[in-house]
Amino acid sequence: MANWPRVSPLAYVALGVLLGLTISIISQTGTTTYDAASRIAILRANRGDPQVDEHDHAHGNDPHGDEEVDDHHANFAPVQFHSNNSSHSHDGESLIADEVAKKVRVFCWILTGKQNHDKRAKHVKATWAKRCNKYVFMSSEEDAELPAINLNVSEGRDYLWAKTKGAFKYIYDHHLNDYDWFLKADDDTYVVMENLRFMLLAHSPDEPIHFGCKFKPFTQGGYHSGGAGYVLSREALKKFIEVALPDKSLCSQNHGGAEDAEMGKCLEKVGVKAGDSRDADGHHRFMPFVPEHHLSPGHVDPKFWFWQYTYYPMDQGPTCCSDYAVSFHYVNPNLMYVLEYLIYHLKPFGIDRAIRVPKNETIIHTAYSISRSERGQDDAFRDRPEVAV
């Protein structure tokens, strides 16, 4: 009989650990690249919902679903940045933006709920909302500090359409003639207001048009994602309230439904165009997810529903997004302040990004000319002649 060498018990332990690690690594291979898509697959399996449903597409199947917006630790006081009041500060850099803000007056309404006043809404107020010409939060509870309006509509996804109708009716009744454009955003949307106005400057508020992240199901000409925010011209708001909303053959009278899709259906039936919000090079300006989702190559499964929904092709990676991006969605309060810092406070020393205004032009005319040159290729009013500004 052969004399086999005696194996130490420790060797068996080491072999077991090594085998376990190997199995663990193999089992994880191929899953990390599309981590978001994996979570969605699990979600669909648990819900028995393999298809994208018209009344649920904007939420349950998102890689950054509402329940994943990490605002559990957001009950901190609004953050105030330093004033940058030094010889190398940003002082004087907003002259053009300030002039455009006088010309393109945007009323912002932010959809929220009483449970989110302290977790989200106050951080929206402390960051981008202050750059609207005027803003208000639409909720189920009044809050003079925000301020928030009580729409007397129940909370929950099943009532988003009712809230949206009520919010636009309130704005029509109180602010129609005081502003040019009317932006709807969520309390986890981050908006670069200067870039929104820059895009809108090429258009007249008398055009029946709305802009946002354009999706293609459910309508002929497209509709706009609710989470990325969408903006209606004054004429679009008038048509929605005066013509579409009172007519049950044009607008759903129910309280439920996908708010963004229902809005798109109503507007299309009264001749309001779903505009092309891309820049002249085809880069997108309204983003329905956080920056990481769009900027990181391979972040999301190519079979993910978004790629079938988007009206215009969108690259995944650094070429996705316009240098004049307008919005991102699923932005938690911490990320909101990070974006605020990166956009409005951080600057590379020695790099001058000033826009040169010719001596024979006004600031607003120069901005208008650049805005027209940056319009999307599918612009609904592209043939509209240049007007005096």
Swiss-Prot record:
Compartments where found: Membrane
Stretches assigned to the Cytoplasmic side: 1-6
BP GO terms, sorted: protein glycosylation
Membrane-spanning intervals of the chain: 7-27
Main location group: membrane
Its EC number(s): 2.4.1.122
Binding residues for a glycoprotein: W305
Any one of the GO CC terms: membrane
InterPro entries listed in its UniProt record: C1GALT1/C1GALT1_chp1, Fringe-like_glycosylTrfase
Enzyme class, UniProt record, top EC level: transferase
Binding of UDP, residues: E155, G156, R157, K163, D186, H329, Y330
Residues noted as binding Mn(2+) in the record, renumbered to the chain: D186, D188, H329
Gene Ontology MF, one: glycoprotein-N-acetylgalactosamine 3-beta-galactosyltransferase activity
Alphabetic keyword roster: Disulfide bond, Glycoprotein, Glycosyltransferase, Manganese, Membrane, Metal-binding, Nucleotide-binding, Signal-anchor, Transferase, Transmembrane, Transmembrane helix
Stated role: Glycosyltransferase that generates the core 1 O-glycan Gal-beta1-3GalNAc-alpha1-Ser/Thr (T antigen), which is a precursor for many extended O-glycans in glycoproteins.
Identification of the protein by name: Glycoprotein-N-acetylgalactosamine 3-beta-galactosyltransferase 1
Naturally occurring in which organism (per UniProt): Caenorhabditis elegans
